Amino acid sequence: MSIIQVSPQLLNQICTHAEQAYPNECCGILMGRLAAEERKILVEIIPTENAWNQETADNFELLETNHQRLTTTERRYTIAPEALLKAQKQGRERQLSIIGIYHSHPDHTAIPSEFDRVCAWLGYSYIIVSVQQKKAADLRSWCLDQQHQFISEEIISIS
């Protein structure tokens, strides 16, 4: 089973970001280290702007009239490539790597959507926060298996 080790402080920062972004999805980058096969250590988070916009939606061909709501930051997120590149460069200087992405699901469960699955990268952790009526209600981590399906990833609290 895949494991991600996270401090309570970082989990709290992720939940706070999710609550502040409500009713929109928040997103950010998980920086850390690979401790062993299928074990990651989260060292810091980098909150990012949700860069989802009409152009992004066009690129994902989501503009059917019955899916208008899915083209907003209330139901979709993306991180600008520049933010990912900057995080990668800063991490390299500190012997850290991008180990995953976090985002929120406003008024939905902390379970990945099909869109989340299709856009996910193998080897990354995906922490999802369910925010119900402006309060973080649940937080779970996921990763892809070899068949590109999400499987639950155990979160171990570290000090």
Where are these regions (language model features)?
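Residue-level "edge-of-site" marker
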Residues: S104
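Conserved beta-strand-loop surface patch within small alpha/beta domains used
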Residues: M1-I98, D107-S159
